[in-house]
Regions:
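Unchanged
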Residues: 40-137, 141, 151, 155-163
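N-terminal strand-loop-strand
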Residues: 1-36
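Short, charged low-complexity intrinsically disordered segments located at boundaries
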Residues: 14-17, 84-86, 143, 147
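Buried hydrophobic packing segments
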Residues: 7-10, 145-152
Length: 163
């Protein structure tokens, strides 16, 4: 089981989350996926360090510019070969995220509430399969990223209902 970490960077009211689009122009398992910045946990790293390193490598988010709030319970991929640790954080000030590597071709904020709408079955543009998710900015939000964001959305929704 390989371990990975993602940065779940939340900002604003209503809450938005930073996502990246994995490049559609390279032949990769993740091509055209809308994802949270993240990747493998290297030897000697913990999930926080890995998520912050990956956010810097993929979206020019410097580790000093975010405040980590919590680590959510890990999410297993459907293939079962990867365990993803979501690291929730907020910006300490203004950010200018942008693609920082050839594996990412877009970086943008989406409303967290988007995952409150039932996902549809759609054809993934780079895989020969249909997935349950959302089409966004030429990519597809689905799989473990979608499950992490839905879990976070339901936590936020229940917190907002309390008096």
């Amino acid at each position: 089981l390989r371990e990975a970490a993602v940065l779940v960077l939340l900002w604003g009211d209503p809450t938005r989350v930073l996502v990246v689009r994995k490049s559609c122009s390279i032949d990769s398992y993740w091509s055209c996926d809308i994802a949270l910045p993240g990747g493998h946990i290297k030897p000697g790293e913990d999930p926080i360090r890995a998520a912050l390193r990956e956010a810097w490598e993929e979206a020019w988010i410097h580790p000093s510019m975010v405040k980590v709030q919590e680590i959510l319970a890990p999410e297993k991929t459907l293939a079962g070969n990867r365990l993803i640790h979501p690291v929730v954080a907020v910006p300490k000030g203004p950010l200018c995220p942008r693609p920082a590597s050839e594996e990412v071709d877009a970086v943008f904020w989406i409303p967290l509430s988007i995952v409150g709408v039932k996902p549809r079955e759609i054809r993934h543009p780079r895989r020969e399969m249909f997935v349950e998710g959302y089409r966004l900015a030429g990519g597809v939000l689905w799989g473990a990223t979608l499950r992490i964001l839905r879990r976070l959305y339901s936590m936020h929704s229940s917190n907002m209902e309390e008096p």
